[in-house]
């Protein structure tokens, strides 16, 4: 079973995809196509709280609210993508959950204002915009969405099916866009996943009745408590070498787009919190901000999966390379990544980057060369893309990392296996 939506796998999957933040735009397009046809289908989009803060989602919300499109948006708020969500929008949603009582007491505000001696009746008759500015001090839940022209319902228990059905039916009866804000728990229903949602985000699916996991080929394993620890991989060596360099070079800063654990930068964050930046699911912003940091004298390192780096193509070309800034782009999970599904392959980034002037591109043959390339990249005054796979490392004997010459290749003879075809 594919790890993300796949139309050939299920009639309930209407779109092939696995990248966060695209749903609102796709849903808007489906709803607009429905309106052009003059039909009456119901269009609903489920978007996570982490995906909501991506640039594409905000662009879509702007258009949806402007056009008043009849569309149901379900905001699935579990405070996580793979790692916990970050940023001002995440803080806003948390504040909304803390002020649930607002809607229950909202009707009392006009009565309170109207009862003020002498000037009460005048206050009660003021314009809607002025009254909104007064009562905004109470932190009205969903005010952000309401101001964009999207009706807000929430916060509701996303695990309460009758409540969900009632809310959805009410939302579908409304004429314009509606957002239903639901609170959920990641991994709900499977205790190990509830206890460790980050690890279980990409774990093999367990057989729930016996608690046994299978590997990619369907071979049953032992009873699952947590996924087995993985062997050391290129990501861990990249992160470890970055930590070593950062200890002596205070210009080095690390940036991730919502994936500190997946890119190994969680260790950098623990060691140097003042030099670590998780910008959320916002790859374009991550790369553009890195350009600014480099222009300001820093040595920024942006670690992003190859598949997600595609989203920041213009920033690599226009911001980093056109300005010839010393940004190190750690292209994690480069190449074929079979178990990550069709939407998460890393085979396109290398071909695309080879067309760009001024960027240096390298890929290590083993973990020791990776360590050397990290240091080599940070010693350059030009953009540097370091591609490395998801794979486990080769077990090459440790050696002191040295700066490598740019443009030189190593000719390694390989023994060909006998083949009968």
What function would you assign to each model-found segment?
Residues 6-24, 47-48, 156-158, 231-232, ...:
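Active-site nucleophile and cofactor-binding loops and adjacent substrate-binding regions
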Residues 2-3, 417-421:
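Short, small-residue-biased leader/transition segments that mark boundaries at the very start
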Residues 139, 166-169, 201, 210, ...:
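Glycine-/acidic-rich phosphate or pyrophosphate-binding loops and their flanking alpha/beta elements
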């Amino acid at each position: 079973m594919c790890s993300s939506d796949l139309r050939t796998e299920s009639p309930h999957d209407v779109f092939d995809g696995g990248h966060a933040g695209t749903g609102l735009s796709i849903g808007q397009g489906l709803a607009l196509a429905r309106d052009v046809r003059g039909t009456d289908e119901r269009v609903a989009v489920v978007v996570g709280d982490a995906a909501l803060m991506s640039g594409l989602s905000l662009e879509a919300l702007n258009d949806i609210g402007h056009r008043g499109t009849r569309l149901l948006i379900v905001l699935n708020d579990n405070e996580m993508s793979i790692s916990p969500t970050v940023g001002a929008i995440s803080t806003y949603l948390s504040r909304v959950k803390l002020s649930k009582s607002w809607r229950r007491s909202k009707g009392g505000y006009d009565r309170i204002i109207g009862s003020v001696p002498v000037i009460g009746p005048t206050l009660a008759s003021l314009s809607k915009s002025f009254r909104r500015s007064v009562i905004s001090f109470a932190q009205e839940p969903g005010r952000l969405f309401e101001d964009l022209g999207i009706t807000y319902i929430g916060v509701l228990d996303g695990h309460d099916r009758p409540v969900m059905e009632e809310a959805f039916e009410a939302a579908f009866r409304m004429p314009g866009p509606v957002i239903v804000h639901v609170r959920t728990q990641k991994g709900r229903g499977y205790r190990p996943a509830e206890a460790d949602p980050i690890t279980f985000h990409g774990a093999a699916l367990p057989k729930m009745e016996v608690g046994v996991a299978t590997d990619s080929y369907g071979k049953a394993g032992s009873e699952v408590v947590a996924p087995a620890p993985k062997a050391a991989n290129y990501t861990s060596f990249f992160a470890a070498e970055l930590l070593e360099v950062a200890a002596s070079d205070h210009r080095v800063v690390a940036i991730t787009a919502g994936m500190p654990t997946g890119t190994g930068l969680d260790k950098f964050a623990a060691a140097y919190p003042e030099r670590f930046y998780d910008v959320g699911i916002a790859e374009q912003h991550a790369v553009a901000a890195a350009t600014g940091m480099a222009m300001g004298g820093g040595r920024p390192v942006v670690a992003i999966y190859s598949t997600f780096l595609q989203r920041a193509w213009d920033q690599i070309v226009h911001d980093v390379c056109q300005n010839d800034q010393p940004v190190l782009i750690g292209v994690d999970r480069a190449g074929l990544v079979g178990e990550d599904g069709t939407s998460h392959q890393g085979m396109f980034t290398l071909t695309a980057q080879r067309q760009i002037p001024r960027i240096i591109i390298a890929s290590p043959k083993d973990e020791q060369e990776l360590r050397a390339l990290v240091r080599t990249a940070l010693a350059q005054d030009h953009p540097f893309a370091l591609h490395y796979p998801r794979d486990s490392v080769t077990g090459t004997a440790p050696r002191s990392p040295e700066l490598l010459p740019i443009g030189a290749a190593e000719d390694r003879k390989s023994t060909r296996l006998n083949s009968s075809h």
